[in-house]
Amino acid sequence: MKNLVILSGAGISAESGIKTFRDADGLWEGHDIMEVASPYGWKKNPQKVLDFYNQRRRQLFEVYPNKAHKALAELEKHYQVNIITQNVDDLHERAGSSRILHLHGELLSVRSEKDPNLVYRWEKDLNLGDLAKDKSQLRPDIVWFGEAVPLLKEAISLVKQAHLLIIIGTSLQVYPAASLYTHAHKDALIYYIDPKAKNAHLPQNVQCINESAVHAMQDLMPKLIEMAS
């Protein structure tokens, strides 16, 4: 089977009702990003950070995978598929995909404030006073601005092995994820799916599809299945 790597971003989950990462005004669901998604914000007002992520975690139980998520899961019948997602939701998992690398963490897990390897699955609200086994406060298992991306090397390794790379639902503006495609083999076929794909200044070997995730995957599926054989 050929190796297919998917790099997914907020655009694919937006079609399930999850708001995209940031609006044009630099706010994230009405919040200053640095207030709710940085070590600075956590130190300044941990309760505000917890409230923000508790709200987002609750929202997960009100949304469902869309046809684009399901199409990517369907491709496992034809390819060795690895999904590298910038999203912190679980919609790829619920759609049926089996190999998913969450580059920026997950809403449904929390970790020790002191030890990033002490991680717990968590579906309820997280509160001040909820402690890890090392007695430190639990925090969202999210890679915040200013923090290293621990799974970056693994993601780069997957991209290097890809015969085919599909970039879907990302503006390619959040680094280091935005530069992942540059690690693809020179002979790899690359598709970039985004409503504003044509505005991106990308190399000629990247085929831009100026559509939403759902529409583009519906159109592309027959070709992808044919190419797998």
UniProtKB/Swiss-Prot annotation:
Where it sits in the cell: the answer is: Cytoplasm
Sorted alphabetically, which keywords does the UniProt record give? Cytoplasm, NAD, Transferase
Q: What is known of its domains?
A: 2 residues (Tyr-53 and Arg-56) present in a large hydrophobic pocket are probably involved in substrate specificity. They are important for desuccinylation activity, but dispensable for deacetylation activity.
Give the Enzyme Commission number: 2.3.1.286
User: Residues that bind substrate, according to the entry?
Assistant: Y53, R56
The species is Helicobacter pylori (strain ATCC 700392 / 26695)
Q: Which PROSITE patterns match?
A: SIRTUIN
Q: Which Gene3D superfamilies match?
A: SIR2/SIRT2 'Small Domain, TPP-binding domain
Superkingdom is: Bacteria
Active-site residues per Swiss-Prot or TrEMBL entry: H104
Encoding gene, per UniProt annotation: cobB
Q: What is this protein called?
A: NAD-dependent protein deacylase
